[in-house]
Amino acid sequence: MSQNRKDDHIKYALEQRPGYNSFDEMELVHRSLPKYDLAEIDLSTHFAGRDWEFPFYINAMTGGSQKGSQINEKLAQVAESCGLLFVTGSYSAALKNPSDTSYQVATGRPNLLLATNIGLDKPYQAAQQAVADLQPLFLQIHVNLMQELLMPEGEREFRSWRQHLTDYSQRLDLPLILKEVGFGMDRSTVEEARSLGIQTFDISGRGGTSFAYIENQRGGNRDYLNDWGQSTLQSLLALQPMRDEVELLASGGVRHPLDMIKALVLGAKAVGLSRAMLDLVKNYSVEEVIDIVEGWKSDLRLIMCALSCRNLQELKNVPYLLYGRLKEAQEQIK
């Protein structure tokens, strides 16, 4: 992927105006008599083979350009200081250009919790190289079919994707996460990928950055596809029957701690933030972003206390109300 395309993605992601967000159509039921003290609230979670202190992380965004390198450097500083997981953008650019150091953010940061990302169009050998280069805690594998179809330079051959997923699962010795890129993930996809050996899924729904919008801004002429896909909460609702069978992660349109809590109520093990973090490092100093993220941790505890939930397991039993398009979609889920 060219540096220009990487920078285009950053540019148009920041320019995109927010549209429909399904998080606004879910309401949590307040509890007036609390069970716990604020100090008792436990934010820890578990997915991809290990425990995590907090149920949110910095999701895959960028790399492969000077601008991407600067953003990754800031995000890595925030992640290490706050004890957050940081997932780099797709490592494909570094595979094409071995001199690219925009992903080498762990250098000099022994406490950084780092994972990386690669597209499912890449064969096992490419994934193996990414793992060897970065030694990530897990490998996030993105599926971006609509984005590829809308890119003039995008992939046009997809039959190999299932075989690649099988190869990754059978031959890579680290946890794998299958990730959408803002179009949502349906139950049949999760069931099939699970049969191929995948246990953890970032369902990344519509509501945040739209790569359909971005590719159309880059010169496409299919604006009518800008809102393609299902929202994050639509995807989580559709996957309720599987939430105890697989590990679900949620991203796409997550703006603040209340959105995070709503996703956790619907069974997500953790919540990924991309656009929200991109906005922060663009508009604030690293020190200010660290303060904001630390505030998010406090806010998560505050909201959980208001819901009389001591931990994430108890959050799954919180009653909620749905409205509008989200309620209509939920009623049609089979």
Curated annotation (Swiss-Prot):
It is an enzyme of class 5 (isomerase). GO terms for biological process: isoprenoid biosynthetic process. Transmembrane segments: none annotated. GO terms for cellular component: cytoplasm. It comes from the Bacteria. FMN binds at residues 60-62, 90, 117, 179, 204, 209, 253-255, 274-275. It catalyses: isopentenyl diphosphate = dimethylallyl diphosphate. The keyword NADP applies. Substrate binds at residues 5-6, 147. The keyword Lipid metabolism does not apply. Its main location: cytoplasm. Belongs to the IPP isomerase type 2 family. Homooctamer. Dimer of tetramers. Involved in the biosynthesis of isoprenoids. Catalyzes the 1,3-allylic rearrangement of the homoallylic substrate isopentenyl (IPP) to its allylic isomer, dimethylallyl diphosphate (DMAPP). This is Isopentenyl-diphosphate delta-isomerase. It comes from Streptococcus gordonii (strain Challis / ATCC 35105 / BCRC 15272 / CH1 / DL1 / V288). The lineage of its organism: Bacteria, Bacillati, Bacillota, Bacilli, Lactobacillales. The gene is fni.
